[in-house]
Amino acid sequence: MIDIKELKFDEKGLIPAIVQDYYTKQVLMLAYMNEESLKLTLEKGETYFFSRSRGKIWHKGETSGNTQKVKKIFYDCDEDALLIQVEAKGPACHTGNISCFYRSFDEETEDGIEILNKLYERIKGRKINPVEGSYTNYLFEKGIDKILKKVGEEATEVVIASKNDSKDEIVYEVSDLIYHLMVLLVEKNITLNDIYNELERRYKK
């Protein structure tokens, strides 16, 4: 393990820290650390950064609740940059996006994991801030029995589509099932990271 003193902080005593989702490997944000904030991160197990604009240390998620539990910290070959893998509790970006890097120079389609994360956050947002006429809010208003009924119905539709052997139909019905499963997860306050954790546990067996 490297001694913090061996890291190459810049002339202002800072080192760039790239934050990456431990499970999805999506890059979440870029921030800066000084020696003290890095020590706090190692000690507390959550990310602490140094704000260049405010000139002080800040704890990620202190006000928003979107904390980042540290899983691993890497440093590069030149010892002048950090890669921090985290288990994120909520979006990393102040805009509400999962990642601060949500804009692109081109129009390429987002990857599947990002779409799932955004869908989950959208459903969660509907529960917190209901929108009149929203089907998602209708499910939350009707409660757990209605949600479970829909999950069961959609699972049956997947079985039927699979028996019909139509790829388009299977994709459509599985998408419906995933959506309703996410509604169930939000209702039960279960995050996608909880699911990623379990899948990782099984993968390592």
UniProtKB/Swiss-Prot annotation:
In which pathway does this enzyme or protein participate?
Amino-acid biosynthesis; L-histidine biosynthesis; L-histidine from 5-phospho-alpha-D-ribose 1-diphosphate: step 2/9; Amino-acid biosynthesis; L-histidine biosynthesis; L-histidine from 5-phospho-alpha-D-ribose 1-diphosphate: step 3/9
**Segment Phosphoribosyl-AMP cyclohydrolase: which positions?**
1-115
Is the Ligase keyword given for this protein? no
Any one Pfam family here would be PRA-PH
Start and end residues of each stretch annotated as Phosphoribosyl-ATP pyrophosphohydrolase: 116-205
Tell me the CDD domains matching this sequence: NTP-PPase_HisIE_like
**Keywords, sorted A to Z:** Amino-acid biosynthesis, ATP-binding, Cytoplasm, Histidine biosynthesis, Hydrolase, Multifunctional enzyme, Nucleotide-binding
Give GO terms: molecular function aspect only: ATP binding; phosphoribosyl-AMP cyclohydrolase activity; phosphoribosyl-ATP diphosphatase activity
Q: Which GO terms describe its cellular component?
A: cytoplasm
Entry annotated with the keyword Nucleotide-binding: yes
Query: Which reaction(s) does its UniProt entry say it catalyses?
Result: 1-(5-phospho-beta-D-ribosyl)-ATP + H2O = 1-(5-phospho-beta-D-ribosyl)-5'-AMP + diphosphate + H(+); 1-(5-phospho-beta-D-ribosyl)-5'-AMP + H2O = 1-(5-phospho-beta-D-ribosyl)-5-[(5-phospho-beta-D-ribosylamino)methylideneamino]imidazole-4-carboxamide
Q: What is its main location?
A: cytoplasm
Q: Where in the cell is it found?
A: Cytoplasm
Query: Broadest EC class?
Result: hydrolase
Among InterPro entries, the record links this protein to: His_synth_HisIE (IPR023019), HisE (IPR008179), PRA-CH (IPR026660), PRib-ATP_PPHydrolase-like (IPR021130), PRib_AMP_CycHydrolase_dom (IPR002496), PRib_AMP_CycHydrolase_sf (IPR038019)
Which cysteine pairs are joined by S-S bonds? Answer: none
Biological processes, Gene Ontology terms:
L-histidine biosynthetic process
Give the family this protein belongs to, as stated in its UniProt record: In the N-terminal section; belongs to the PRA-CH family. In the C-terminal section; belongs to the PRA-PH family.
Q: What is this protein called?
A: Histidine biosynthesis bifunctional protein HisIE
Organism for this UniProt entry = Caldanaerobacter subterraneus subsp. tengcongensis (strain DSM 15242 / JCM 11007 / NBRC 100824 / MB4)
